[in-house]
Curated annotation (Swiss-Prot):
Residues 15-24 have a biased composition (Polar residues). Keywords: Nucleus, Ribosome biogenesis, rRNA processing. SMART domains: G_patch. The keyword rRNA processing applies. Pfam families: G-patch. Residues 25-79 form the G-patch domain. InterPro entries: G_patch_dom, PINX1. It comes from Ajellomyces capsulatus (strain NAm1 / WU24). GO terms for biological process: rRNA processing. Residues 203-214, 243-256, 269-288 have a biased composition (Basic and acidic residues). Involved in rRNA-processing at A0, A1 and A2 sites and negatively regulates telomerase. This is Protein PXR1. It is found in: Nucleus, Nucleolus. The gene is PXR1. Belongs to the PINX1 family. The lineage of its organism: Eukaryota, Fungi, Dikarya, Ascomycota, Pezizomycotina.
């Protein structure tokens, strides 16, 4: 028994580089891809596609896998082990020996500095890298050419007056309104523009105008029977207006009445007003139905029991 650790017997496989699957032509993937027009060494996708110019030699190659040789997590990179230090100064020295100017050396140094900063940010905070999936539409930018005639004379553009430009800018509705006004059809306005209140007012006014025109036509006629009918209609309207006056919240005070009678009349009015309000409240009471009704009764009983001291003592079994 020595101090040596346990021996690990490793067996080298027949395919250490793992390239047998890419060379085999008997697999299902190779067969179906070759049936669809793929050949070994060519990249995937149509060769006449709009984004075919962006393909490189790497597009035809396989996906490379780096073997993990450290205890870091997946996707981690060795930071400072493989990076040489002092290489920037050495490259600058070689550039001066080759006869490069100071401006060129400063530009190269700035590029390297920016690249180092980008690498540091990517390692520290992880940036997103976008891969282009191809061009959707193959656009061609055409240069604008001056429109000239065959003889070299410039084509004269028709001059448009200021009024015509204004008329073009105006909306169609405004033009239609102006045309109607010119014709004299002011009554034919768009009903869609009018609000519903305006529509109701217009209807009422039209009805009143019709009634007044009918009354005037009846009055203009000379027969005594028709005049009597018109008088009756007008009297009926006056009576209706007197019977149904508008409700007013303001109190009416009669200066002619004495103070005693005035106070009595005010008390009678207030009593009538309160009675009316009570009747309205009774009518407007919400009466729940079904489950809500039973729940409401139980809640009322609980409230009454809590308000009564005897019932509380009975609930908690306390002797008074």
């Amino acid at each position: 028994m020595g101090l040596a650790g346990p021996r690990k017997r490793t067996k080298i496989s027949h395919d250490p580089n793992n390239t047998a699957w890419s060379r085999s032509t008997s697999g299902y993937g190779h067969k179906i891809m070759s049936a669809q027009g793929w050949t070994p060494g060519s990249f995937l996708g149509a060769s006449n596609a709009a984004h075919a110019d962006h393909f490189t030699a790497g597009s035809a190659g396989h996906i490379r896998v780096i073997l993990k040789d450290d205890n870091l997590g997946l996707g981690a990179k060795l930071r400072a082990e493989d990076e040489p230090t002092g290489l920037d100064a050495f490259q600058g020295l070689l550039g001066r020996l080759n006869g490069k100017s100071d401006e060129e050396l400063e530009k190269e140094l700035k590029k390297r500095h920016d690249r180092q900063l980008a690498n540091f940010v990517e390692k520290r905070w992880k940036t997103m890298q976008f891969v282009s999936g191809g061009l959707l539409v193959h656009e061609k930018i055409q240069a604008l050419a001056d429109v000239k005639s065959a003889g070299g004379e410039e084509v004269q553009t028709p001059q448009i007056s200021h009024d015509e430009l204004k008329s073009e800018k105006r909306p169609k509705k405004a033009r239609k309104k102006e045309k109607r006004r010119a014709r004299g059809d002011d009554t034919g306005l768009d009903l869609a523009e009018q609000s519903p209140k305006r529509k109701r007012k217009d209807r009422k006014e039209n009805k009143e105008k019709k009634k007044s025109s009918d009354d005037s036509s009846y009055a203009n006629q000379g027969t005594p029977s028709e005049d009597a009918l018109v008088d009756k209609i007008q009297k009926k309207r006056k009576k209706r207006k007197q019977k149904d006056p508008e409700p007013s919240n303001t109190e009416v005070h009669d200066d002619s009445l004495p103070p005693d009678t005035r106070s009595v009349s005010q008390e009678e009015q207030e009593s009538r007003y309160s009675a009316k309000n009570e009747s309205i409240r009774k009518i407007r009471e919400h009466r729940p139905m079904g489950r809500q009704f039973t729940r409401g009764r139980h809640i009322q009983q609980k409230k009454l029991a809590l308000m009564d001291s005897k019932s509380i003592s009975e609930i908690f079994m306390v002797k008074c």
